[in-house]
């Protein structure tokens, strides 16, 4: 763990003088270039990103802890196996949308809304393809599980359905979150994060006790519903140039 943590530190220490003193000295950070007048906007935007990240941590990093406390470590293993299987879709879709944030920012500065609309339509088409692939993965999940972990661990088909729904919603919201982050209109996403973070734990606990480990996954999907509805609506408002009030913040 020590070597793993130290490795990036050494890389940064070695790369910094070469990058900013030899190859790109004009990009070297300096206190003389700091402009206080931009501090309010930057810190305000940074604070919103920070709160959103903390909220996402609550939403996405507590499932294993909740399942372990409510049903025992064995159920965590079952949930994680199903999640890792379908997370192939998440990883593939994340690779596709990873350049979207910066590209949207550049297009928004240029007021190139046609390009933004074209790209988002392509992303939605790719998302639909991922859903189709996910359905095939669901149909063959039992066979894959038996080949992967044998017959000792039984993963309910209902749990696979829940995880696929969650992964699909997560990809949908991630696509529009990249757009919202790119244009810097974070207030709606911030409100969604606060609302979902407050209601996720009680909803997930109730659903968990009613439906087992899969109920926690249902709670996570429910927590994504505000994002899944409001972020696309904000995107449509931007294209129609009708962003007003909180939608434009």
Feature roles, as predicted:
Residues 1-23, 199, 213-237:
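Hydrophobic alpha-helical transmembrane segments
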Residues 5-12, 57, 84-87, 122, ...:
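Residue-level recognition of pore/gate-forming positions within transmembrane alpha-helices
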Residues 15-60, 103, 111-114, 238-249:
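Interhelical loop/hinge segments that connect adjacent transmembrane helices in multipass membrane
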Residues 39-43, 112-128, 135-140, 157-160:
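Interfacial transmembrane-helix starts/ends
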Residues 48, 63-65, 77-93:
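Alpha-helical transmembrane segments of polytopic membrane transporters and translocases
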Residues 73-75, 113-114, 139-168:
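Interfacial segments at transmembrane-helix termini and the short loops linking adjacent helices
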Residues 87-110, 179-182:
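Helix-loop junctions and terminal segments of transmembrane helices
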Residues 165-195:
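Membrane-interface junctions at transmembrane-helix termini in multi-pass inner-membrane proteins
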């Amino acid at each position: 763990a020590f070597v793993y943590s130290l490795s990036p530190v050494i890389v940064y220490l070695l790369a910094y003088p070469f990058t900013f003193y030899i190859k790109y000295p004009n990009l070297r950070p300096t206190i003389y270039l700091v402009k206080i007048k931009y501090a309010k906007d930057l810190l305000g935007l940074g604070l919103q990103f920070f709160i959103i990240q903390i909220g996402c941590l609550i939403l996405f990093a507590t499932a294993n802890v909740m399942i372990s406390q409510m049903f025992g470590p064995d159920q965590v293993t079952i949930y994680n196996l199903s999640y890792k299987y379908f997370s192939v879709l998440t990883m593939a879709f994340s690779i596709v949308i990873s350049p979207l944030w910066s590209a949207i920012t550049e297009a928004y500065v240029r007021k190139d809304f046609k390009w933004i609309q074209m790209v988002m339509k392509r992303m939605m088409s790719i998302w639909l393809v991922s859903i189709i692939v996910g359905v095939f993965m669901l149909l063959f999940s039992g066979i894959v599980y038996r080949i992967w972990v044998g017959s000792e661990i039984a993963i309910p088909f209902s749990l696979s359905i829940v995880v696929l729904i969650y992964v699909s919603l997560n990809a949908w919201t991630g696509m529009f979150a990249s757009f919202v982050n790119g244009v810097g209109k974070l207030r709606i996403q911030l409100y969604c994060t606060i609302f979902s973070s407050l209601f996720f734990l009680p909803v997930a606990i109730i659903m968990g006790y009613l439906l087992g480990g899969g109920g926690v996954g249902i709670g996570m999907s429910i927590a994504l519903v505000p994002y899944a509805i409001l972020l696309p609506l904000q995107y449509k408002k931007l294209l129609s140039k009708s962003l007003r009030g909180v939608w434009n913040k």
